[in-house]
Amino acid sequence: MNTQNIYNNKDKDININTNSNTKIKICGLTSPAEARYLNENHVDFAGMVLFFPKSKRNISIEQAKEIMAALDASIKRVAVVVSPSIEQVRQIEASGFDYIQIHGEIPETEAEAAIAIPILKAFNVSDMGSYEKYHNDSRIAGYVFDAIEPGSGKTFDWKLVDNIPRDEKLLLLAGGLNPDNVRMAIEAVHPDGVDISSGVENDDGAGKNPDKIHDFVAAIKS
């Protein structure tokens, strides 16, 4: 899939690397120490959950800025939100994120007040049918396909993604991935990238585990 020039606005073009390597996104970072784990393993995207107190991975904008400051410049910063308000979107835009990953509804704006950073639209197995609603939306840089409960560590039937037409936009597969099943997932779906959170956390669910991150990346690149 050619994923060059997937999002354009009047100020900049965003290009996704089109080499054959599967992109890697580690989501739900909560500390600068975890950012360093990503640096050591040369991942592509770092996700931070904002404005969603129901999540144990929810952090403040100030905490996110500290994490972003610890990330290598090559790692794309992704704000992960659920049906954000336009005021929350504006805070994200002003904080240095490269992408905004939106679960739920995208806020409506007037043309002159358009969202200024690329959007990754997230879908779970219960709303994959709404993909068509966003297929021709020029604001969308890519899609994240997840299980019915994002961040739960549960997988879904990967064959469901076969029904999604492939286009020039980035396709990330999430939902229950871990070092043991990620190769199988890549071979089944052929996504542009994979997205993981709980699968690389400590056994007690508190924080990311550097060994699991290493094993996850190694499984993909082996």
Identify the function of each model-found stretch.
Residues 1-222:
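Conserved N-terminal beta1-alpha1 strand-loop-helix module at the mouth
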